[in-house]
């Protein structure tokens, strides 16, 4: 007899307005001396591990390209939640950029490991590439 398939976690992005996997923000116009210029996306985490699981979502912003994961950068935002098996967690993530340039916004999914009593990187992540330009 075959054993059941191993459980998994998943993370994906949805656009802010329609909550669909299309029309992600790619360009941000920085508005002079007004408030911070921001973009928002929905980050969705799903638990298909067969049991309750605690997750940590780290939001990081880096200039330019990413060479490896997890990204060597401090998290701008951190979210923690325990999900039941089959449960979905939707986080509205907002990113503020004030300097022109090319950015990678990274959402890393970390999973709680009871043996080490720490969150470990799941190797599941999403990257949103955004070019920020100044209003002319």
Where are these regions (language model features)?
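Short solvent-exposed strand-capping/beta-turn motif centered on an Asx-Ser/Thr pair
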Residues: 46-51, 98-100
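Terminal connector regions
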Residues: 97-136
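Short aromatic-acidic-glycine turn motif
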Residues: 3-22, 61-73, 114-119
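Beta-sheet-dominated interaction scaffolds and their linkers
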Residues: 8-42
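Short edge beta-strand/loop segments characteristic of extracellular beta-sandwich folds
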Residues: 40-48, 94
């Amino acid at each position: 007899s075959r054993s059941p398939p191993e459980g998994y976690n998943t993370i994906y992005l949805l656009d802010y307005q329609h909550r669909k996997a299309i029309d992600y923000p790619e360009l941000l116009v920085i508005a002079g001396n007004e408030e911070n210029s921001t973009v928002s996306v929905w980050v969705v985490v799903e638990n298909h591990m067969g049991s309750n699981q605690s997750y940590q979502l780290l939001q990081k912003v880096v200039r330019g390209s990413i060479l490896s994961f997890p990204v060597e950068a401090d998290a701008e935002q951190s979210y923690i939640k325990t999900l039941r098996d089959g449960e979905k967690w939707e986080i509205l993530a907002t990113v503020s950029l004030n300097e022109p340039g090319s950015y990678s916004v990274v959402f890393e999914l970390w999973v709680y490991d009871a043996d080490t009593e720490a969150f470990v990187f799941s190797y599941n992540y999403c990257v949103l590439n955004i070019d920020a330009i100044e209003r002319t």
